[in-house]
Amino acid sequence: MMSRSSSSKGLVRDGVRRSLWAVVLSTLAFVVSMLLPSLMNMQQALENRKGMIVDGARASELAQSWKSSLADAAIYIGGENALVKLAVILLAVVAGTAMFAYLHDKRKVDFYHSLPVSREKLYLVNFVTGAVCVIAPYLVLRVLTLVCAHAMGFGEAVSVGTYLGVILCDILFFLLMYAMSALSTILCGNTIIALLLQLWVYLAPLAIQMMHEGLLSLYCKTYDSISYSDLFNHLRLSPAATYFMVNGANYGSGLADNFIRAGKPAYMLLAEYAAAALFIIAL
């Protein structure tokens, strides 16, 4: 019979306990990027509304101002909050690197591989541990932010369906970039090299496309700049860049006037990234 300490649940529980710093870091990151900006925005909107009432604003003006306040709140609460996306990307890099950095230390490798646990199971435990350390605080802060929004009267800003789409999108992109970070760390024999490889993997498609556009614009006088939709197609290999172009389960509505996908469902894109995440994790 497998002992409790060597069971999958026991190993994950012990891993999370040893990685409390990651839980604290994730909680702090989402408080600063998600909860605080939302509270500050909603509080400012309420103060502005109170000032308009004191000044004797007409009902139509109050309604228009409130509609604008709800739209602004939706940005911070929903899927167009760039601070949350940045936090997700950074935490994916930190978790992916930290959970597998032991492979770069011979003494730690000897210790972990001497445990009565297969290497496949050890990989799965480390991967799940890192995911739990980030996703659990994320979900808690998402729920807390939504509760605060309803308590302050901004429940109409984002529907429940849209909010669930935002949560699923954030988790999907986190798992994809977390898997890419973990794979880079496993393949490299040095943590610094692993971080540089991750930087290249995340940003190389964007950098290459920018250089391509810049050189053509500089040396080809008849060159017509690429459209936003074509640029998006070229950036599909860069999940970090694409992440900022989606709003939950839809493409971002405020990206650009000539972006034909703006506001439309992004189910196919998310399915492609989900398949990519599963493939990388299975490696």
Per-segment meaning from a language model:
Residues 4-5, 40-78, 203-283:
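Terminal transmembrane helical anchor/hairpin motif
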Residues 17-56, 82-94, 198-209:
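Hydrophobic alpha-helical transmembrane segments of multi-pass membrane transport/permease proteins
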Residues 44, 101-105, 109, 192, ...:
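Juxtamembrane/interface segments at transmembrane-helix termini
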Residues 92-94, 172-179, 272-282:
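Hydrophobic cores of alpha-helical transmembrane segments in multi-pass inner/ER membrane proteins
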Residues 100-132:
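Helix-loop-helix units of permease transmembrane domains in multi-pass membrane transporters
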